[in-house]
């Protein structure tokens, strides 16, 4: 999980100490539809998973995203 949180912090350009698995994606100051798409694309590349847009729209927190990756 920590590796994932470090990766998410890098994508969002924040310090890893500022986030944890309960962090909502809406908490990021740069959050918007383009950032959501960027995050999904980065996750798909790094973790070699496919996240359909319907599923991506349901992901609301880092924990949701991590759980999705683990289930894939």
Kindly label every feature range from the protein language model.
Residues 40-72:
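C-terminal structural segments of small proteins and small subunits
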Residues 4-7, 22, 44:
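Generic signal for short, ordered secondary-structure residues
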Residues 11-30, 47-58:
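Phosphopantetheine carrier-protein modules
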Residues 1-2, 37, 62:
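Generic non-transmembrane alpha-helix signal with a bias for helix starts/N-cap capping motifs
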Residues 27-45:
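Phosphopantetheine-attachment site and its flanking helix in carrier
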Residues 1-17, 71-72:
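Thiotemplate assembly-line natural product biosynthesis machinery
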């Amino acid at each position: 999980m920590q590796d994932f949180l470090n990766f998410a912090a890098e994508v969002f350009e924040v310090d890893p100490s500022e986030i944890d698995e309960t962090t909502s994606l809406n908490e990021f100051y740069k959050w918007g539809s383009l950032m959501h798409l960027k995050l999904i694309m980065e996750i798909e590349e790094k973790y070699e998973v496919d996240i359909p847009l319907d599923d991506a729209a349901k992901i609301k927190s880092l924990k949701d995203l991590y759980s999705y990756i683990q289930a894939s």
